[in-house]
Amino acid sequence: MEEPQSDLSIELPLSQETFSDLWKLLPPNNVLSTLPSSDSIEELFLSENVAGWLEDPGEALQGSAAAAAPAAPAAEDPVAETPAPVASAPATPWPLSSSVPSYKTYQGDYGFRLGFLHSGTAKSVTCTYSPSLNKLFCQLAKTCPVQLWVSSTPPPGTRVRAMAIYKKLQYMTEVVRRCPHHERSSEGDGLAPPQHLIRVEGNMHAEYLDDKQTFRHSVVVPYEPPEVGSDCTTIHYNYMCNSSCMGGMNRRPILTIITLEDPSGNLLGRNSFEVRICACPGRDRRTEEKNFQKKGEPCPELPPKSAKRALPTNTSSSPQPKRKTLDGEYFTLKIRGQERFKMFQELNEALELKDAQALKASEDSGAHSSYLKSKKGQSASRLKKLMIKREGPDSD
């Protein structure tokens, strides 16, 4: 019985299947190393793992796998130490600003104020300004000319800064920035950082600044005096995100603050206006102006579930009659001079007397007509009775 076992121990290392199984018993850190020499193979066959495998191949393979598992973290090979992909941490929210800039109008010593071009509300318009709302309606990445008017020329080195803030009080501490979708699109960025909302078009001296304390974005350009034949300076701004973008403004109204500053950053003038970036500026301007005229204030946007069409109160198709003006109201009239006062007093008394006589005459005529109607009814009934009496004997 011992001879077959000895023969088996000699024949097993020479077979290909046995060699492949033994190759799997090697530690992971030696898989990519050079092939072992004949001496190392002899040592391998004399090891305890090989002896156990010869007795019971299944248990030996399980034991070798269990032994190789704790040794894997200690291996220094970069292939064996490749970590599993870790889920990316959620993006941290944008920090809130420590201060809210003022947006109150301040003309200063130089009479600083803003102006806009006159434009209609057609569908083809890309930028339009509403004076009654003090609101600019524009399309995404379209030119928005803003005029700067001053009563006297500012000192050399004066700069113009544009900054956007949220209009509503509960959002004022948040920094206005583009949505993630528009941040990833590098179209039209140029020198501007991708998260900046306001850009300046056609000015190579524009500086895009991020305040380290307030975290707010602004764009600064040097002030240029008006050209010959012009009374104002025009700066062309672009807004690079829609007001309805999720993750950005998210339908929250914003204000653009334009400030005039000296080289040291001191304020020389300030003005602001509301901005809405939308697909159809003309239509939105007409809608908001109508709501403003009806209610005296901008109509708040209704949530999607409550946006129902209001039914008219009067469903009848007949036109309503016009209400007559009432003459029972009293008015006070200031008259200079006593003579004029007496003249108007006599005129007023005469008109009052005329109205009283007309009222009395209408009452008398109404009573007389009712009396005639009653008399006429009585005479008709008497005539019928007489005719019946006269016809009575003839019928008999």
Curated annotation (Swiss-Prot):
Q: What organism does the UniProt record list as the source?
A: Mesocricetus auratus
**Site of the Glycyl lysine isopeptide (Lys-Gly) (interchain with G-Cter in SUMO) crosslink?**
389
Instruction: Name the segments for region: Oligomerization.
Output: 328-359
Residues recorded with modification N6-lactoyllysine: 123, 142
Q: Which disease is it linked to?
A: p53 is found in increased amounts in a wide variety of transformed cells. p53 is frequently mutated or inactivated in many types of cancer.
The family this protein is said to belong to: Belongs to the p53 family.
Q: Where is this motif: [KR]-[STA]-K motif?
A: 373-375
Tell me the protein's name.
Answer: Cellular tumor antigen p53
Q: Which domain of life is it from?
A: Eukaryota
Q: What PROSITE patterns does its record include?
A: P53 (PS00348)
Q: Where is this region: Required for interaction with ZNF385A?
A: 103-303
Residues forming the motif Nuclear export signal are 342-353
Q: Which residues, renumbered to this chain, carry the PTM N6-acetyllysine?
A: 123, 308, 324, 376, 384-385
Q: Name one GO molecular function term.
A: DNA-binding transcription factor activity, RNA polymerase II-specific
| Purpose | Multifunctional transcription factor that induces cell cycle arrest, DNA repair or apoptosis upon binding to its target DNA sequence. Acts as a tumor suppressor in many tumor types; induces growth arrest or apoptosis depending on the physiological circumstances and cell type. Negatively regulates cell division by controlling expression of a set of genes required for this process. One of the activated genes is an inhibitor of cyclin-dependent kinases. Apoptosis induction seems to be mediated either by stimulation of BAX and FAS antigen expression, or by repression of Bcl-2 expression.
The residue ranges flagged as biased composition, category Basic and acidic residues, are 286-298
Q: Which residues carry this modification: N6-methyllysine?
A: 373, 375, 385
State how the cofactor is bound.
Answer: Binds 1 zinc ion per subunit.
Q: Where is this region: Transcription activation (acidic)?
A: 1-45
One GO cellular component term: nucleus
Where do the record's region annotations for Interaction with DNA lie?
Answer: 276-283
Output the InterPro entries linked to this UniProt entry: p53-like_TF_DNA-bd_sf (IPR008967), p53/RUNT-type_TF_DNA-bd_sf (IPR012346), p53_DNA-bd (IPR011615), p53_tetramer_sf (IPR036674), p53_tetrameristn (IPR010991), p53_transactivation_domain (IPR013872), p53_tumour_suppressor (IPR002117)
Which residue ranges does the record annotate as region Required for interaction with FBXO42?
116-239
| Interaction with HIPK1: region residues | 103-373
Q: Where is this region: Basic (repression of DNA-binding)?
A: 371-390
